[in-house]
From Swiss-Prot:
The keyword ATP-binding is annotated on this UniProt entry: no
EC number(s) on file: 1.1.1.35, 4.2.1.17, 5.3.3.8
Region (3-hydroxyacyl-CoA dehydrogenase): 1-384
This protein's name: Putative fatty acid oxidation complex trifunctional enzyme
Region (Enoyl-CoA hydratase/isomerase): 453-720
Record field: catalytic activity: a (3S)-3-hydroxyacyl-CoA + NAD(+) = a 3-oxoacyl-CoA + NADH + H(+); a (3S)-3-hydroxyacyl-CoA = a (2E)-enoyl-CoA + H2O; a 4-saturated-(3S)-3-hydroxyacyl-CoA = a (3E)-enoyl-CoA + H2O; a (3Z)-enoyl-CoA = a 4-saturated (2E)-enoyl-CoA
Keywords for this protein: Fatty acid metabolism, Isomerase, Lipid metabolism, Lyase, Multifunctional enzyme, NAD, Oxidoreductase
Length: 720
């Protein structure tokens, strides 16, 4: 595409601004990060420098790999405005005050190229107000891109445009957000709070205010929301703490100032004395001294506590016995929470449906927003349509009992037109393909003239049938002279071995069958590695244990940036048994530093936090990283790979080292030290070693560890 976005300027180096800059850097695009001049320091860029340093300190790292910081150029708004001239996109992420934003826009306009897009990351201010004083040639390329925090990990971006925006601007920003940054765009109308804040914050305030007024238990309410309505474990009050009470007050105040008095947000946002008192005592949530919940430490143990609203004291969270498993059971019960939730759900859906079509005329976008932005299992329309019996009729009946007027959407029964199929908006390529081979654990399919291997077990775990069919698939691909693609069913590449199967062999003392499974897996990995056609793995989510071994034996990997991969078998007291150990030795090939690192990968269960870390830590050179997990198959099919030059197994050089002297083993347990000694014996016995010999050692060590009580205990803990 011509005139694509190659360089971005982010203005505002707070948590959100620096997070967006890091996200752009993760995509290997150049980004300029600017903020105001620090007049109290000799260093004019102190504010931005501190923000960039903080990128390396956060619990959820904004950077996918430390050296991605090199894509960030820093500066200030007094000396470095010329840097904006190089940028195709400017994202403003400053304080939510209209006059200050207007001052900034006027300041940067002289430095903009004629086609540079300007985007505000506001979550509260309307697009119309932001651009009201701008020249027409700027208005036509001024938009809102509302990222969610933390930007690296949250998939959703709300995009707000109007009819003055040029089509090429919409196309350019859409491609950048989806293909380059890996986001899912939801287009919203220019209304207060857009979709996410208008819907989500209404529910948070509705529940919090009603629960406090009725003196109900926060823990019970949160658990009901999680179990019966599909909200994350944070529930309502945990999420309120996560967002921050001070931030919630700012959002709600902004919404109230923008919404007409007739809007129900005014009605439900009443008596804020408790909230104000909590803010006054710095009980603003996780970033304060507590919130509705807090974590305290007693005798070295963390204890979750819940607040007593009457005096702002805290007491330990007690286990709550909830007798209902879904919304139907809850609403049919005689619990005080049945009446509470009946009223909450009715008021919420009355408000929600009143927003159609003013906020958006697409109810599926509302659902997608709540699932992506708030991590709900169901979207609100999906919940009432699919997961609740007679859900819409119940809302209408309750509204009548509560003397609440129905919005047009409900009164005209628009909900009867809902297409249930649209709730699953992701394209299922399996519906457009032909099955070539299949068993109860995997399929080989023909899709767009390509052969694709799809594992169909839970979490794509590996067992005999997966390996049998994969070997057949490799043979079929070789016969056709076609590359073979391994693509995950669902969001994860593979969680590794079927541990339930392995534990059953151990418990039955059936170590011959266990060894046969190891041999089968090793043989399959050799099929992949030495195939005459390319094996191209499309990896997203997790690729752990055996899943990681599949990647290590592939010709090419197309991986989503957020891939979590690694040889983590030691977590259950085992070692990689399907060539993982052999691959770690082979990739070292005589290099002492690499061998030490690779041994630590195994012993310390190195589960990488990104594809970039996997590439570096596991010495993976044949990998393309893609920011959007939904496009990895498309990108894999586009790979222009030459005919494969088939390699043959070769001897692997082993450096003469003393492993214990090279690794800090002070925190290792007996099992870890035992395996280190096994590896040391291999190194001591051989100057060089064949893959076949290493595979034999691998099986022997695995089988020995499988008999250890610690291993059996760990397996039981995982399998249950």
């Amino acid at each position: 595409m011509q005139n694509e976005i190659k360089k971005v300027c982010v203005i505002g180096a707070g948590v959100m601004g620096s997070g967006i800059a890091a996200l752009i850097a993760n995509s290997s695009h150049r980004v300029v990060l600017l903020d105001i001049l620090d007049k109290d320091s000799n260093d004019p860029n102190k504010i931005v420098k501190n923000a960039v340093k903080n990128l390396h300190r956060q619990k959820l790292p904004p950077l996918s790999y430390p050296d991605k910081v090199n894509f960030i150029t820093i500066g200030n708004l007094e000396h470095d405005l010329d840097l904006i001239k190089e940028c195709n996109l400017v994202i403003e992420v400053i304080v939510e005050k209209l006059d200050i934003k207007h001052q900034l826009y006027n300041k940067i306009i002289p430095y903009l190229k004629e086609d540079t897009i300007i985007a505000s990351n506001t979550s509260t201010l309307p697009l119309k107000k932001l651009k009201e004083n701008l020249p027409n040639n700027i208005k036509s390329r001024f938009i809102i891109t509302h990222f969610f925090n933390p930007p690296r990990y949250m998939e959703l971006v709300e995009l707000i445009i109007d009819n003055t925006i040029k089509d090429e601007v919409i196309e350019k920003i859409s491609v950048f957000l989806t293909k380059i940054l890996g986001k899912t765009i939801i287009k919203c109308n220019d209304t207060p709070g857009f979709i996410a804040n208008r819907v989500g914050c209404f529910l948070l305030e509705l529940v919090a205010h009603k629960a406090i007024a009725q003196n109900l238990d926060f823990v019970t309410i949160d658990q009901i929301f999680s179990r019966c309505l599909g909200l994350p474990n944070t529930g309502i009050f945990g999420l309120y703490d996560l967002i921050g009470h001070d931030v919630m007050k700012l959002i709600s105040s902004s919404l109230l100032s923008a919404l007409p008095k007739s809007d129900d947000y005014h009605r439900i946002y009443f008596n804020t004395k408790v909230f104000d008192k909590m803010i006054e005592h710095n009980l603003i949530g996780r970033k304060g001294e507590g919130g509705f919940y807090r974590l305290s430490v007693s005798n070295g143990k963390k204890i979750k506590e819940v607040i007593n609203i009457s005096d702002l004291s805290y007491h330990p969270v007690q286990k709550v016995d909830i007798s209902f498993n879904n919304l139907d059971e809850l609403l049919a019960s005689d619990s005080i929470y049945s009446k509470f939730f009946s009223e909450i759900i009715t008021e919420f859906y009355i408000y929600l449906t009143s927003l159609v079509p003013s906020v958006t005329n697409n109810i599926y976008d509302i659902d997608a927003t709540m699932k992506l932005g708030y991590s709900w299992h169901y979207g609100p329309f999906e919940l009432l349509t699919i997961a609740v019996k007679n859900g819409w009729n119940s809302i209408i009946k309750n509204a009548d009992l509560m003397n609440i007027s129905l919005p047009k959407y409900l009164a005209s029964k628009e909900y009867q037109k809902i297409d249930k199929q649209k709730f699953n908006s992701k394209k299922d390529f399996l519906q457009e393909s032909t099955i070539v081979l299949a068993n109860d654990s995997a399929n080989l399919i023909h899709y767009c003239e390509n052969l694709i291997f799809v594992i169909t077990t839970k979490m794509n775990t590996l067992n005999h049938n997966v390996f049998y069919l994969l070997q057949e698939a490799v043979s079929k691909a070789e016969n056709y002279g076609k590359n073979l693609y391994i693509f995950p069913q669902g969001n994860n590449f593979s969680a590794g071995a079927d541990l339930k199967l392995i534990l059953s062999y151990i418990q039955d003392g059936n170590f011959d069958n266990l060894e046969n499974l190891l041999k089968l897996g090793q043989q399959t990995m050799r099929y992949l590695k030495y195939s005459s056609v390319h094996i191209i793995s499309c990896a997203r989510g997790v690729a752990l244990g055996g899943g990681c071994e599949l990647l290590l034996n592939s010709s090419y990997i197309v991986a989503n940036q957020e891939l979590n991969a690694g040889l983590i078998e030691f977590g259950v007291g085992l070692i990689p048994g399907w060539s993982g150990v052999t691959e770690m030795f082979a990739r070292s090939n005589g290099d002492k530093t690499k061998l030490i690192r690779n041994i630590k990968n195994i012993i310390e269960q190195n589960k990488t936090s990104s594809a970039d870390y996997f590439k570096a830590d596991y010495d993976v050179s044949n990998m393309q990283v893609n920011m959007n997990k939904h496009y990895i198959l498309d990108e894999a099919l586009k790979l222009n790979v030459s005919n494969k030059i088939v390699s043959i197994p070769h001897k692997i050089a082993l450096p003469k080292i003393n492993i214990v002297s090279e690794i800090d083993t002070s925190k290792y347990n007996d099992l870890q030290n035992k395996v280190l000694n096994k590896f040391q014996n291999i190194i001591d016995k051989h100057n060089e070693i064949s893959e076949a010999e290493l595979l034999t050692y691998e099986r022997e060590i695995f089988l020995e560890l499988a008999k250890e009580p610690q291993t059996i205990e760990k397996l039981h803990a995982i399998v249950g």
